[in-house]
Every structure is written in structure tokens, then in C-alpha cells.
Curated annotation (Swiss-Prot):
The lineage of its organism: Eukaryota, Fungi, Fungi incertae sedis, Zoopagomycota, Kickxellomycotina. One of its GO terms (cellular component) is mitochondrial inner membrane. Residues 12-38, 95-248 are mitochondrial intermembrane. This is Cytochrome c oxidase subunit 2. GO terms for biological process: ATP synthesis coupled electron transport. Keywords: Copper, Electron transport, Magnesium, Membrane, Metal-binding, Mitochondrion, Mitochondrion inner membrane, Respiratory chain, Translocase, Transmembrane, Transmembrane helix, Transport. Component of the cytochrome c oxidase, the last enzyme in the mitochondrial electron transport chain which drives oxidative phosphorylation. The respiratory chain contains 3 multisubunit complexes succinate dehydrogenase (complex II, CII), ubiquinol-cytochrome c oxidoreductase (cytochrome b-c1 complex, complex III, CIII) and cytochrome c oxidase (complex IV, CIV), that cooperate to transfer electrons derived from NADH and succinate to molecular oxygen, creating an electrochemical gradient over the inner membrane that drives transmembrane transport and the ATP synthase.
Amino acid sequence: MNIFSFYIINNDAPEPWQICYQDSATKIMSGIDKLTGEIFYYETLLLIIVGWVLISAIIKYTKTELSYKYFNHGTLIEILWTCSPAFILIAISFPSFKLLYLMDSIIDSQITIKVLGHQWYWSYEYSDYLDNSGDSISFDSIMIPTDDLEPGQFRLLEVDNRIVLPIHTHIRFICTSSDVIHSFAVPSLGLKIDALPGRLNGISTYVEREGTFYGQCSELCGVYHFGMPIVIEAVRIEKYLEWLNIHLDNTPSS
């Protein structure tokens, strides 16, 4: 590894014993990561303060004959320990309201992708594009078995057909299910939406950098729930157009 390198290696896939988020590729996920870090900091500070008060009180009042050790009611202290957590929760909730609003907002999209959950694989349809026969681009995405993986690929996360998206483009996912409840989730993009049978749910994203992003079904959907990985490959618009041409079969015949 070159310590003088100006390149940043992003973590877009889960790792063993990982306890933090994957690196974000959207502003929404960056906001979620930042908010989580701030809340964790203040929670740690509160834990230290409250723990110190409790331990100090235990040590002090078990070694003294003061009458306060038998004190079992106090209006002021009860108001304080009731109102203080309420104010803290309110202060924490306000920054999250903006993120919740942005996550639920459906922006005018340039590309719409339909997502259909099955037991146990995903189907995708690019309904904005039609091939020479008038059909839209659609394909199934099935997990690659462990025995068929190539060196460097992730177990239980690789699929035979990936979603390919252009960066710096507003994209909308419309999700539903053909059988049971599934959940379409890609942590690096801040995407998580339920796929419900008989109902359409929508979510928008705007990918800011190239990369390969991994996700999974996040709703227990049966015995092979683990076998529903999601792989999204974000590329430059030029590569995306090349991918479209291949799938639309627009190459002139010789």
C-alpha cells in the first residue's frame, strides 16, 4: 500500500466482524452515518455521566449514617429524571426528521427500475428502454453458488446478473413481490424498502461515485432467505450506454 497515494479505497461490501456502516455513496447514507456517529457520541457521554452519578451515590450513601439514605420521594428529582430524557430524545429526533423526509421523497427520476421479489431471487425491469422487438430490458438475478465463485468474489453476495446504474443520475426503484414480503436493501446507497405482494413501494437514489455495492433481502422470507443478494454496479454514463446497447441489441448487423 502506498501511503502517498491520493486514491481512496471504499468499503462497499460487508466484512467479517464488521460493526460499522459500509462507505456511503449517496448523500442520504452520508447523513445517516453522520447522525449515527453524533448520537453515539452523546449517548456515550450520557452513559459516563449517569454511571458516575449512580456509582458515586452508591459509594457515598452506603458508608454514611445520613438520613438521606432512607429518602424515598422527591418531586424535584423525579421531574428532572423524567424531563431530561424527554428533552434529549427531542433534540436527537429533530436532525432525523430531515433524513426521514428525504428518504420518503420521490424525486422526478430519469431512470425507473422495477424490482420484483420472489422466493428466492430478484427480477429487474428497465421499463424506460425498449429493444427492437418492443420489449423492455428485464432479467432475473440469482445468487451464484459457492462452488462457482471466482477468486475475489464474495460468498452469498454475488449474483449472475447485476443492476447497472449511471452515476450522477436520479433513479427510482419501484418494488413489489410475487409471493411473500421481501425487503430490498443496499446499505452503501441508503436504500431499504419493503417489497409487498399486491402493493407498489417507491424509493429514489442518486449515486455519487462509481463502485459495486452489495445488499441483501432484509425481511425474513423463508428457508432460503439468505440466498437473495443484491448487487448494484454504478458506472459512468458512457459505460452505462454501452451496457444498454448490448442489452437492447442496437449494434448494426454487418
